[in-house]
């Protein structure tokens, strides 16, 4: 894949999360014929290999060519997984439209030649080449020579073009062309037929290997265990297929309503028509009525306004107001023109329009942006259908270990062939014995053993109200070493209590008006702002909306109504929202206030603005938002000089502070024509709204538990920086002895380059710091003692963006100690999580779903505290809306990881014990009988495999993690040491039994009554007690090796069953302990009981009691040595840490490398300094390593 023909290679979705490499290939008839012949002569093995390795299928059938000539494309993901897939290039024929619309090859099919659709149509035959990848269509752009996504309006369109080109709808001809090329507007998730699920599961390499093993066992008349494996496989496959089928049905029900909605579509010539939503295409003009409607596509609002419930996307059921896209004479793309807040104009698929307000034309109109799987809901569904692979390192290690076992089996096969060929055995017997070695050395149950711990952990989590849609991520939970938390609704309570209002005038701030006293708020602009500056709606007689807005409005004791119901005021449009004072409100000179227009709140802008009309009075604009943002839009002389210190008083106590401002407008301006920039300027500052947002009771103890376990905790919030710092201190995320350093970065302005400054936050000394974005207390100096303490960096989303753009080399150094990230937008939250992952942290993200969906999806482990549909994108959802689920999840993850490794070690040892025993017996051209194999495989190993994993998670989080890799020194040493120990014991038993005075190769007798008499034990081969069926297996070597191997399997299970510090002690697993006791008792009973019939069944020989005691002694010594080695060496963390230090081993994790390289620089952090992006030294700074997390990554 290193050399490509010209035009053969390209990138699909370049720069996006689902970026892929695409390679062009052309099918060759001769290659196809050869592969068909190979499939026949290999009895279907070749197609199976091609199924497992898609790239091999393409390389075998096709030759490389340019993408333009390709009929097959090979796709490879650009992430670390490098997953291959292939797709056939298909043709879409538009020739059918010739007769319907009279199209000619030269006829422009679209009104603009720049549209992708025009460039994708091959003329004169009117055909389109396309591929379908993960439910998305990509068409070949002949002009640019690349595959491009179709099903969306082009991003380059400006707002003026959207209004002009699509404001009147599409012609019928354009609709039909787009329908053919873009496909139907459906999110089809078919309920996968059971037979398909069954075939897919059966073709798993694990089950193919089992099929091979079963066939071999049937040929050897080893029917009992073959049937047992078949039954277990059927149960396993049935459960898996059932789970997959249930998930498929649930997902189908989740999206099926989307495909059967009737909508009103306006055509350019056809007028308004009622159509099925499945026929919608990008560019269609939707007409929204006042009725509730579920959006079947993504659409941009161009006229009127809507109130939308976006709970499915955000996890939050607070209605959101959408405003029309302004028509501006500019060629700038509409998303760029709207900046980060373009979503305020977009109605997303799957959201519910609960209220549509018409504009002057009397209609609410929206242009379809995206259809089908290109929509927001389609993207969410695709993330479920095609999840990002997890725990790849563990899977890769498992494959490597299996390959080692295969290598061992190969050596055993060569040994077997040599022994049996030299012995003159028949060829078919030699082959059968050689193949037996594979099923012994590579046990069919090995892959399943790795998942059993996960299954039990999932059940325990379910009992705690934690639900999981991606069970494989439970193991990843055991590796978490950094957890990010949203603040509002996650660390703090959902509800906000209005504590008071601080108004201001020319003399500065007035006394706090407390609502606890029950006194009504005096009339004035501040009262009017509280009554009208919100996004509340009246739905079925109930006021609904953001809790903050609701608390603020309720404090005024005003009422809400529609203008069309009780009021008929000139200049107020029909059905405008009107607020009016009630009887209990203070004396008000106006009859009411009509809300004419809203500029909705967004987390990116951190403010909202409304235009209102006092009935019989002035037209006003009110703004509400983050204090620092609102103050920046006000006339400087109206902002009190004590603004910073006043704000500090409340934010340092953890209050949430909102600022209010207003201005008068001219009555002759139409409210909807005014731009946001015009309205939001030269405002008059009104005061501060103080709301209380208390910590949840569970927050502090949970964070203390995580920190004591050396798991980093990070806060990512959209709230004020000072409030975030206060919450971090109150919650224990930042202790009293630790310092907080503010990092502030500013964009390039004029001639000055981007800058970054570092300041120590001081809680005791109050000094004014007048920057608009951050109002916190600082101090100028840091004592030497302070420098030696722990530091936590705090910064805003704006600073994070500037650092990412202009100081990227400093970003990893800042993240080493970055703890508080405030004013973060949803996109910045996702980016921050990704940056932590680049430093090799295992990142967890816990949020309530509101604005956290991207970060929840990006993290290794996303934990949603919301039960909305958005939680579908998160692997874990907690029914209990607090962060107590986080330590529970980590504990269960650690337990599941340790359990998986324990089972892996046990299954590997069990196979090696049996492997060693069989190869020793092969030396004597002997083996174990079917019943002997059955007893070991079914009665011992299967029962242990089922019960060994029942240990629960240890209730305490320890300050280190379990090993995250199968190929780790302690685990490898444990496996190799125990294999060698068992090998030594088996060889010793094998040799010693042959040197006993009573030993004879001619003994084939069952037990005698007086077996102490050697003479009675030594019988002739022709003795009547001899049984023909036993002549192949019965020998003293067989008896000795079988007892040693069988009981060794039991003792190894006890040695490998781990308890503290990650799992409950073994003695608490009562079922497992009982199984071991019964198994050991049965084995000892068989060993010492003289029951001829039992011995005949198991093909065993009686031996003197002294030899039986010798077997027990050998097993006891083996158990004691193994247990001591496991506890004193393998599980001795202190010893391994000392060995690491002696050999100078250092972690290769990126963040550990940063810590080692930058830990001892006395100049870090550069306090009271400002660096600029054009200064060379700013990119070569050094970082401070936080001693709190110094040994966070140490693991065995």
From Swiss-Prot:
Residues 1-31, 53-197, 245-400, 458-900, 954-972, 1057-1070, 1131-1196 are cytoplasmic. It holds the Pfam family E1-E2_ATPase. PROSITE patterns: ATPASE_E1_E2. It comes from the Eukaryota. GO terms for cellular component: early endosome membrane; endoplasmic reticulum membrane; late endosome membrane; plasma membrane; recycling endosome membrane. The chain crosses the membrane at residues 198-218, 224-244, 401-421, 437-457, 901-921, 933-953, 973-993, 1036-1056, 1071-1091, 1110-1130. Induction: Decreased by half in the SLI patient lymphoblasts. GO terms for molecular function: ATP binding; ATP hydrolysis activity; ATPase-coupled monoatomic cation transmembrane transporter activity; metal ion binding; P-type ion transporter activity; polyamine transmembrane transporter activity. Gene3D superfamilies: Calcium-transporting ATPase, cytoplasmic domain N (3.40.1110.10), Calcium-transporting ATPase, cytoplasmic transduction domain A (2.70.150.10), Calcium-transporting ATPase, transmembrane domain (1.20.1110.10), HAD superfamily/HAD-like (3.40.50.1000). It is linked to A chromosomal aberration involving ATP13A4 is found in 2 patients with specific language impairment (SLI) disorders. Paracentric inversion inv(3)(q25;q29). The inversion produces a disruption of the protein. Belongs to the cation transport ATPase (P-type) (TC 3.A.3) family. Type V subfamily. This is Probable cation-transporting ATPase 13A4. The gene is ATP13A4.
């Amino acid at each position: 894949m290193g050399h490509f023909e010209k035009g053969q290679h390209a990138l699909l979705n370049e720069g996006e999360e689902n970026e892929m490499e695409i390679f062009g290939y052309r099918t060759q008839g001769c290659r196809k014929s050869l592969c068909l012949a190979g499939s026949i002569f290999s009895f279907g093995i070749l197609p199976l290999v091609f199924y497992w390795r898609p790239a091999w299928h393409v390389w075998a059938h096709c030759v490389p060519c340019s993408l333009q000539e390709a009929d097959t494309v090979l796709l490879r993901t650009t992430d670390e997984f490098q997953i291959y897939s292939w797709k056939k290039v298909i043709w879409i024929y538009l020739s059918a439209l010739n007769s319907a619309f009279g199209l000619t090859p030269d006829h422009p099919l679209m009104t603009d030649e720049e549209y992708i659709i025009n460039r994708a149509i091959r003329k004169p035959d009117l055909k389109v080449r396309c591929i379908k990848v993960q439910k998305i269509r990509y068409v070949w752009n002949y002009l640019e020579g690349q595959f491009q996504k179709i099903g969306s309006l082009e991003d380059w369109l400006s707002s003026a073009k959207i209004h002009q080109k699509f404001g009147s709808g599409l012609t019928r001809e354009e609709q039909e062309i787009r329908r053919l090329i873009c496909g139907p507007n459906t999110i089809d998730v078919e309920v996968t037929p059971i037979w398909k699920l069954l075939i897919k599961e059966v073709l798993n390499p694990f089950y193919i290997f089992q099929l091979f093993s079963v066939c071999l066992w049937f040929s050897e008349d080893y029917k009992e265990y073959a049937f047992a494996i078949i039954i277990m496989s059927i149960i396993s496959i049935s459960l898996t297929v059932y789970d997959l089928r249930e998930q498929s049905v649930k997902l189908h029900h989740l999206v099926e309503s989307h495909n059967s909605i009737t909508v009103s579509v306006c055509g350019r010539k056809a007028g308004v028509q009622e159509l099925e939503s499945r026929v919608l295409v990008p560019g269609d003009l939707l007409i929204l009525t006042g009725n509730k409607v579920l959006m079947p596509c993504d659409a941009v609002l161009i006229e009127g306004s809507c109130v939308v419930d976006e709970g499915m996307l955000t996890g939050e059921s607070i209605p959101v107001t959408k405003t029309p896209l302004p028509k501006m004479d500019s060629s700038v793309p509409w998303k760029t023109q709207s900046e980060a807040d373009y979503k305020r104009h977009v109605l997303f698929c799957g959201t519910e329009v609960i209220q549509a307000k018409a504009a002057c034309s009397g209609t609410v109109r929206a242009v379809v942006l995206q259809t089908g799987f290109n929509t927001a809901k389609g993207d969410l569904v695709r993330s479920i259908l095609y999840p990002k692979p997890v725990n790849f390192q563990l899977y890769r290690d498992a494959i490597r270990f299996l390959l080692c076992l295969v290598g061992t089996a190969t050596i055993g096969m060569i040994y077997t062939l040599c022994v049996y060929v030299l012995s003159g055995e028949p060829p078919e017997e030699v082959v059968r014995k050689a193949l037996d070695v594979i099923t012994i050395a590579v046990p069919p149950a090995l892959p399943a053993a790795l998942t059993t711990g996960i299954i039990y952990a999932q059940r325990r989590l379910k009992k705690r109200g934690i639900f999981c849609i991606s069970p494989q991520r439970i193991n990843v939970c055991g590796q978490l070493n950094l957890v990010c938390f949203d603040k509002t609704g996650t660390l703090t309570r959902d509800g906000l209590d209005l504590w008071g209002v601080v108004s201001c005038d020319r003399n500065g701030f007035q006394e706090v008006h407390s609502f606890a006293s029950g006194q009504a708020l005096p009339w004035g602009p501040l009262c009017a702002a509280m009554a009208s500056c919100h996004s509340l709606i009246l739905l079925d007689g109930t006021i609904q909306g953001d809790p903050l807005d609701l608390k603020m409005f309720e404090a005024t004791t005003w009422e809400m109504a529609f203008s069309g119901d009780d009021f008929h005021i000139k200049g107020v449009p029909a059905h405008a929202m009107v607020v009016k004072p009630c009887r209990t409100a203070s004396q008000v000179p106006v009859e009411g206030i009509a809300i004419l227009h809203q500029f909705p709140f967004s987390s990116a802008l951190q403010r909202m603005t409304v235009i209102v009309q006092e009935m019989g009075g002035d037209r006003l604009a009110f703004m509400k938002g983050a204090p620092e943002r609102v103050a920046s839009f006000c006339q400087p002389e109206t902002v009190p000089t004590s603004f910073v210190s006043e704000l500090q008083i409340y934010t340092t106590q953890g209050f949430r502070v909102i600022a209010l401002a207003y201005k008068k407008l001219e009555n002759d301006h139409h409210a909807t024509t005014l731009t946001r920039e015009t309205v939001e300027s030269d405002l008059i500052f009104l005061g501060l709204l103080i709301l209380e947002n208390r910590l949840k009771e569970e927050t502090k103890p949970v964070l203390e538990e995580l920190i004591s376990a050396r798991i980093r905790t990070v806060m990512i919030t959209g709230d004020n920086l000072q409030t975030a710092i206060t919450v971090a201190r109150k919650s224990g995320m930042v202790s009293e002895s630790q310092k907080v350093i503010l990092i502030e970065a500013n964009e390039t302005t004029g001639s000055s380059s981007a800058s970054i400054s570092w300041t120590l936050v001081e809680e005791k000394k109050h000094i004014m710091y007048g920057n608009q974005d951050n109002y916190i207390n600082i101090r100028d100096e840091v004592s030497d003692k302070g420098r030696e303490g722990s530091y936590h960096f705090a910064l805003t989303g704006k600073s994070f963006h500037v650092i990412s753009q202009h100081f990227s080399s400093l970003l990893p150094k800042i993240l080493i100690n970055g703890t508080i990230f405030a004013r973060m937008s949803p996109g910045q939250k996702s980016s921050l999580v990704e940056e932590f992952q680049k430093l090799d942290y295992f990142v967890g993200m816990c949020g309530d779903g509101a604005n956290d969906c991207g970060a929840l999806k990006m993290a290794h482990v996303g934990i949603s505290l919301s039960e909305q549909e958005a939680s579908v994108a998160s692997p874990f959802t907690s029914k209990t809306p607090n962060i107590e689920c986080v330590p529970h999840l980590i504990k269960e993850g650690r337990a599941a990881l340790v359990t998986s490794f324990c089972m892996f070690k046990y299954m590997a040892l069990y196979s090696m014990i049996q492997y060693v025993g069989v190869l020793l017996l092969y030396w004597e051209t002997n083996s174990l009988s079917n019943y002997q194999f059955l007893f070991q495989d079914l009665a011992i190993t299967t029962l242990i495999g089922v019960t060994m994993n029942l240990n629960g998670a240890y209730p305490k989080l320890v300050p280190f993690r379990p090993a995250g890799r199968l190929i780790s020194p302690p685990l490898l040493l444990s496996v190799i040491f125990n294999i060698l120990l068992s090998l030594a014991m088996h060889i010793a038993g094998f040799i010693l039994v042959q040197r006993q005075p009573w030993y004879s190769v001619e003994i084939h007798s069952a037990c005698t009554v007086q077996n102490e008499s050697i003479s009675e034990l030594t019988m002739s081969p022709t003795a009547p007690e001899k049984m023909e069926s036993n002549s192949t297996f019965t020998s003293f070597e067989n008896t000795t090796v079988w007892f040693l191997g069988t009981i060794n399997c039991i003792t190894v299970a006890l040695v490998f069953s781990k308890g503290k510090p990650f799992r409950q002690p073994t003695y608490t697993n009562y079922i497992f302990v009982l199984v071991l006791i019964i198994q050991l008792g049965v084995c000892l009973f068989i060993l010492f009981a003289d029951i001829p019939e039992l011995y005949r069944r198991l093909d065993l020989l009686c031996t003197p009691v002294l030899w039986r005691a010798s077997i027990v002694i050998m097993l006891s010594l083996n158990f004691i040595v193994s247990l001591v080695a496991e506890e004193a060496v393998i599980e001795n963390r202190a010893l391994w840490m000392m060995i690491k230090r002696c050999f100078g081993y250092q972690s290769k994790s990126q963040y550990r490398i940063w810590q080692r390289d930058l830990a001892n620089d006395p100049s870090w952090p550069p306090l009271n300094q400002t660096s600029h992006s054009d200064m060379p030294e700013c990119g070569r700074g050094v970082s401070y390593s936080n001693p709190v997390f110094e040994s966070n990554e140490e693991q065995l």
